[in-house]
């Protein structure tokens, strides 16, 4: 029952946390920030491909 409520709540919200009103202009940036570590992971593969996986 509780799990269903949490799942429905998360699916209804576009973001998991709401920023205070003063930080509303930064909302698109906050949505992108979790992707940055994945970009570093991809960069490691591109780097290794450029040196032929030595």
Swiss-Prot record:
InterPro entries: PSII_PsbK (IPR003687), PSII_PsbK_sf (IPR037270). The chain crosses the membrane at residues 29-49. Residues 1-17 form a propeptide. Its main location: plastid. Signal peptide: none annotated. It comes from the Eukaryota. Keywords: Chloroplast, Membrane, Photosynthesis, Photosystem II, Plastid, Reaction center, Thylakoid, Transmembrane, Transmembrane helix. It is a single-pass membrane protein. GO terms for cellular component: chloroplast thylakoid membrane; photosystem II reaction center. Pfam families: PsbK. One of its GO terms (biological process) is photosynthesis. It is found in: Plastid, Chloroplast thylakoid membrane. PSII is composed of 1 copy each of membrane proteins PsbA, PsbB, PsbC, PsbD, PsbE, PsbF, PsbH, PsbI, PsbJ, PsbK, PsbL, PsbM, PsbT, PsbY, PsbZ, Psb30/Ycf12, at least 3 peripheral proteins of the oxygen-evolving complex and a large number of cofactors. It forms dimeric complexes. Belongs to the PsbK family. One of the components of the core complex of photosystem II (PSII). PSII is a light-driven water:plastoquinone oxidoreductase that uses light energy to abstract electrons from H(2)O, generating O(2) and a proton gradient subsequently used for ATP formation. It consists of a core antenna complex that captures photons, and an electron transfer chain that converts photonic excitation into a charge separation. This is Photosystem II reaction center protein K. It comes from Euglena mutabilis. The lineage of its organism: Eukaryota, Discoba, Euglenozoa, Euglenida, Spirocuta. The gene is psbK.
